[in-house]
């Protein structure tokens, strides 16, 4: 009976977890921000000088043939010479669909959807202000390619203002990397001092996340400051209030499942992280850097970095010690991080993510074996006490208080913990939840094949074979546990339906997670047989 109740407890905890994470995604209140960091849209101008996406961009300049194209081993980028905005970015090494040659496009600007990275110079003498429009840069050519044997590729753009000041904007691309350096060089050849301020922002059409209860994912903004290591800023929150947070260093990003774009200004600079939603339905998040005063005859360099690529924790950590937090494992991150490390460790040896998941399942089950043994031992003792418990029920009848006292005395006398069977399950659930988020968030599993019909561990089984096998394994586990005659009929019914309910739930789960659960069930069945054999020798059945 105790074992049956434990299986029922697993089911209830599992369903509760799904409902809780859906509530977190939809209804959970965001942290209360200080008055200085968030202000109402109606009463603030987040950055009066920061231009809108298309301000000052002639229609003719948006034609594909006028864009500057850049090709590296990792990125296929298009830059609009008006302003020098990145208006297109395809990830060459990451395909849109498995087995197809079409690369995954992260940034683009189409008739119905905008997702671009904008940067420029604002301030008193800025060349990209909302009032003056955008600077029309000139380039030596319109096509740049990272050649074989070349580690970096520079794309210089030049603009000469009416006062004779030369502004050079250089994009520096790196082999094997998804980050781009954006460097401004300002040569003040005028007779007057200049005052400029760099900004960078990401603009995206507000679009709902392709999320579900089974695979909750986040699409929206996020930022980091010296006081807030990592915080999501949902589109609906951006529509209600503007972010305006002074900080040293920091970063601003747009997130979606597996991929991220982010502005990372220098960590030693004084910046302001800001956000807004424009009238055209564009969500904006970015940074404004320090104000620079440039004396006549002086030259000033201002730099920042932009990342556009997968949520690769190693690459992100190299840019900022908090940018890797965009791989969000939730409240059990402290448990998920070592699990992810172990998963990567196994994969580096076996070269197959499915086999790595099996190995980590065996590891987890092996580490939890003492708890599992204690669980079944406690359940066996409880079963042996059933005749005595039944005798207490008959003796005390409806007097629940006396019967409860007698039961506690019996447990104490027989050295049985009535919660002994539940505690190991409660300890195992956090591990399952942490692994769930690791498999959901780790971009390494995107398009990662296993074997046979499983070609992508990050999506559901196309033929539902793994979920059906998982349900069958639950049915076997259930049948190995006899139903006690004293068990409530309603509980019996719920237990009989539990494998079916779990199978239905797991139909839409990533096949990597179903594989973990299936292998875990098989190992549990084997462990159960081994433990029961030992208990029978001790007279516990």
Curated annotation (Swiss-Prot):
Listed transmembrane segments: 6-26, 349-369, 420-440, 457-477, 500-520
Subcellular location: Cell inner membrane
Topological relation to the membrane, as annotated: Multi-pass membrane protein
CC per GO annotation: plasma membrane
InterPro entries for the chain: Membr_insert_YidC (IPR019998), Membr_insert_YidC_N (IPR028053), YidC/ALB3/OXA1/COX18 (IPR001708), YidC/Oxa/ALB_C (IPR028055), YidC_ALB_C (IPR047196), YidC_periplasmic_sf (IPR038221)
Annotated coiled-coil segments of the chain: none
This protein's record includes keyword Repressor: no
UniProt KW keywords: Cell inner membrane, Cell membrane, Chaperone, Membrane, Protein transport, Transmembrane, Transmembrane helix, Transport
Molecular function, one GO term: membrane insertase activity
Pfam families xrefs: 60KD_IMP, YidC_periplas
Primary localization: membrane
Biological process, per Gene Ontology: protein insertion into membrane; protein transport
Subunit structure: Interacts with the Sec translocase complex via SecD. Specifically interacts with transmembrane segments of nascent integral membrane proteins during membrane integration.
Role according to the record: Required for the insertion and/or proper folding and/or complex formation of integral membrane proteins into the membrane. Involved in integration of membrane proteins that insert both dependently and independently of the Sec translocase complex, as well as at least some lipoproteins. Aids folding of multispanning membrane proteins.
Entries under HAMAP family matching the protein: YidC_type1
Family of the protein in this entry: Belongs to the OXA1/ALB3/YidC family. Type 1 subfamily.
Protein's recorded name: Membrane protein insertase YidC
């Amino acid at each position: 009976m105790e074992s049956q109740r434990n299986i029922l407890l697993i089911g209830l905890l599992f369903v509760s977890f799904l409902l809780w994470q859906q509530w977190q995604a939809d209804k959970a209140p965001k942290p209360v921000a200080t008055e200085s960091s968030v202000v109402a849209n109606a009463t603030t101008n987040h950055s009066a000088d920061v231009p809108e996406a298309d301000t000052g961009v002639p229609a003719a300049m948006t034609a594909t043939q006028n864009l500057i194209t850049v090709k590296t081993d990792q990125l296929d980028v298009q830059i609009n010479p008006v302003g020098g905005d990145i208006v297109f970015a395809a990830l060459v090494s990451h395909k849109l669909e498995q087995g197809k040659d079409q690369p995954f496009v992260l940034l683009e600007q189409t008739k119905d959807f905008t997702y671009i990275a904008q940067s420029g110079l604002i301030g008193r003498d800025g060349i990209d202000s909302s009032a003056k429009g955008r600077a029309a840069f000139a380039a030596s050519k319109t096509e740049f390619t990272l050649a074989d044997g070349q580690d970096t590729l520079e794309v210089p753009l030049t603009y000469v203002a009416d006062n004779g000041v030369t502004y050079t904007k250089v994009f520096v691309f790196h082999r094997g990397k998804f980050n781009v350096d954006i460097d401004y060089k300002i040569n003040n050849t005028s007779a007057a001092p200049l005052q400029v301020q760099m900004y960078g922002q990401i603009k995206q059409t507000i679009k709902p996340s392709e999320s579900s209860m089974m695979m909750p994912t986040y699409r929206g903004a996020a930022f980091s400051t010296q006081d807030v290591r990592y915080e999501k800023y949902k589109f609906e929150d951006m529509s209600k209030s503007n972010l305006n947070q002074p900080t040293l260093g920091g970063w601003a990003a747009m997130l979606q499942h597996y991929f991220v774009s982010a502005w990372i200004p220098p960590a030693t600079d004084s910046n302001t992280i800001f956000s807004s939603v424009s009238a055209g339905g564009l969500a904006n998040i970015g940074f404004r850097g320090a104000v620079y005063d440039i004396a006549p005859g002086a030259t000033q360099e201002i730099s920042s970095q932009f990342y556009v690529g997968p949520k690769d924790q190693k690459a992100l950590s190299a840019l900022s010690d908090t940018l890797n937090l965009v791989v969000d494992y939730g409240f059990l991150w402290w448990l998920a991080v070592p699990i992810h490390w172990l998963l990567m460790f196994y994969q580096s040896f076996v070269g197959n993510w499915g086999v790595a998941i099996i190995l980590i399942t065996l590891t987890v089950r092996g580490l939890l074996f003492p708890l599992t043994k204690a669980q079944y031992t406690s359940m066996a003792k409880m079963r042996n006490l059933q005749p005595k418990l039944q005798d207490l029920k008959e003796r005390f009848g409806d007097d629940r208080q006396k019967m409860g006292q007698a039961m506690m005395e019996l447990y104490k006398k027989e050295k049985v913990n009535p919660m002994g069977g539940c505690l190991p399950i409660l300890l195992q659930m956090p591990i399952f939840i942490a692994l769930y988020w690791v498999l959901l968030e780790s971009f390494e599993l995107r398009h990662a094949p296993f074997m046979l019909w499983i070609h992508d561990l990050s999506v559901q089984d196309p033929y539902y074979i793994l979920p059906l096998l998982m349900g069958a394994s639950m049915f076997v586990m259930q049948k190995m546990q006899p139903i006690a005659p004293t068990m409530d009929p309603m509980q019996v019914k719920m237990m009989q339906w539990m494998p079916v309910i779990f199978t239905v739930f797991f139909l839409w789960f990533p096949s990597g997670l179903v594989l973990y659960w299936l292998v875990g069930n098989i190992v549990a069945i084997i462990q159960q047989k081994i433990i029961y054999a030992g208990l029978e020798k001790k007279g516990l059945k």
